[in-house]
């Protein structure tokens, strides 16, 4: 069946035809039948260079040999035990070894589950209610954080979701990213702050980087006020450095969440933090968290192989991706400048995004002012030329270890044509 026929069929049994909002784009999304390395193939047999990469999960590329071998071996032993396994402890030790801020780890399944638990831990630890989040930061689709969120929520213009409880969201205070004064004023006005949660690099409102001293000032202020600081490293964990953004910036949070690149494409997440906080989790403590699939041996085997591969490659991996990103982003900037197209390019590590605006993009408000229609034109032209990026300016373009210089050159040629379509 073709993409169009499959989508018509899907809409009959799946709301809007997709299982996550940002996967939809007009007139219909393509349906993937297989993937390998840096490429995916749709049901119409088009080969696409993949820069969506599972929205950042596939740091090592599709079907990475080390991970496939590890998972295949585990499949012969079973898929779900619902008992402790040796692999869970091995994985926890690997995570702790890469993240010095973490004393103990609890495994889960999704990024949203991890942030939900992190917030519950902060409330249990402080015995307070209110959480501070930043505009445009996306921490999953649960009520506590689905307020002025990024990702698909921003793309679809949903500031607060229908069905969410005001009684829950009223305990979420929203401040502007990269604005320390706004944070200080909010803390001064509210004495019931249980925690502050932040994406250290904002990767769900396009790509927005923390300004100089923002994260260090954030850490200082939360310490001075005895407020737990939660780093949501669901995207940045392992992607920007083996120890995530906290290694990259030299900041130690109290609680960390991670997922995505943790397992390179398998459903697993983790919450880690200081011993005195983590020991509050049940059954030893009174902060409840549970899941049938938490620590399942398939995902654990993938995560162990992923971290071991990352640790083995380390400088070689990250220096390659940073070099590719610098070359690509610089060339893209030159192209758009030569064409006279107002734009901003934000990039770091293995992530970048172009915004069609003449003003720096440093927060939620400036991101929303970028020309979304021009971005959609860019996206469609790239797709026609065999390049797949996320279909929203509020997402990020992700490089993987599977990408080659030839892939980048082909992609730059496609971006050149796409920018021409934007200009016209």
Curated annotation (Swiss-Prot):
Zinc listed as a keyword: no
Family annotation (Pfam families): Aminotran_3 (PF00202)
Pathway: Porphyrin-containing compound metabolism; protoporphyrin-IX biosynthesis; 5-aminolevulinate from L-glutamyl-tRNA(Glu): step 2/2
EC number: 5.4.3.8
Family of the protein in this entry: Belongs to the class-III pyridoxal-phosphate-dependent aminotransferase family. HemL subfamily.
Catalyses which reaction(s): (S)-4-amino-5-oxopentanoate = 5-aminolevulinate
GO BP term, example: protoporphyrinogen IX biosynthetic process
UniProt entry keywords in alphabetical sequence: Cytoplasm, Isomerase, Porphyrin biosynthesis, Pyridoxal phosphate
Protein location: Cytoplasm
Cofactor dependency: pyridoxal 5'-phosphate
SUPFAM superfamilies: PLP-dependent transferases
Gene Ontology terms: cellular component: cytoplasm
Presence of keyword Isomerase: yes
Modified-residue entries (N6-(pyridoxal phosphate)lysine), positions: 260
Entry protein name: Glutamate-1-semialdehyde 2,1-aminomutase
UniProt GO molecular function: glutamate-1-semialdehyde 2,1-aminomutase activity; pyridoxal phosphate binding; transaminase activity
Annotated disulfide bonds: none
């Amino acid at each position: 069946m073709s993409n169009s026929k499959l989508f018509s069929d899907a809409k009959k049994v799946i709301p809007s035809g997709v299982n996550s909002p940002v996967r939809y784009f007009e007139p219909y999304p393509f349906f993937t039948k297989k993937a390998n390395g840096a490429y995916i193939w749709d049901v119409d047999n088009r080969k696409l260079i993949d820069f969506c990469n599972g929205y950042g999960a596939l740091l090592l590329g599709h079907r990475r040999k080390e991970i496939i071998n590890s998972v295949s071996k585990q499949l012969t032993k079973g898929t779900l035990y619902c008992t402790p396994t040796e692999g869970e402890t091995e994985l926890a030790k690997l995570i702790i070894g890469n993240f010095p801020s973490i004393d103990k780890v609890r495994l889960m399944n999704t990024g949203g589950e991890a942030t939900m638990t992190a917030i519950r831990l902060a409330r249990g630890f402080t015995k307070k209610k209110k959480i501070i989040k930043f505009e445009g930061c996306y921490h999953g689709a649960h009520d506590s954080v689905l307020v002025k969120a990024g990702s698909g929520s921003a793309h679809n213009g949903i500031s607060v979701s229908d069905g969410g409880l005001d009684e829950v969201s009223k305990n979420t205070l929203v401040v502007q990213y990269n604005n320390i004064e706004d944070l200080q004023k909010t803390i001064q006005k509210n004495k019931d702050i249980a925690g502050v949660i932040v994406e250290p690099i904002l990767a769900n409102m396009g790509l927005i980087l923390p300004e100089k001293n923002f994260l260090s000032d954030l850490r200082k202020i939360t310490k001075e006020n005895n407020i737990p600081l939660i780093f949501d490293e669901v995207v940045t964990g392992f992607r920007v450095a083996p120890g995530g953004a906290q290694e990259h910036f030299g900041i130690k949070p109290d609680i960390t969440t991670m997922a995505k690149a943790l397992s390179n494409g398998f459903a697993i997440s983790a919450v880690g933090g200081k011993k005195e906080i983590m020991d509050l989790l049940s059954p030893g403590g009174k902060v409840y968290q549970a899941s049938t699939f938490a620590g399942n041996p398939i995902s654990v085997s993938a995560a162990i192989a992923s971290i071991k591969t990352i640790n083995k490659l380390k400088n070689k991996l990250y220096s390659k991706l940073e070099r590719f990103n610098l070359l690509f982003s610089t060339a893209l900037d030159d192209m758009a400048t030569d064409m006279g197209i107002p734009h901003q390019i934000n990039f770091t590590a293995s992530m970048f995004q172009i915004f069609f605006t003449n003003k720096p993009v440093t927060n939620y408000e400036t991101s929303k002012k970028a020309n979304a229609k021009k971005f959609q034109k860019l996206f469609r032209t790239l797709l026609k030329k065999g390049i797949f990026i996320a279909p929203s300016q509020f997402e990020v373009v992700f490089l993987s270890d599977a990408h080659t210089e030839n892939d980048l050159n082909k992609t730059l040629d496609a971006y050149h044509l796409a920018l021409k379509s934007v200009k016209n």
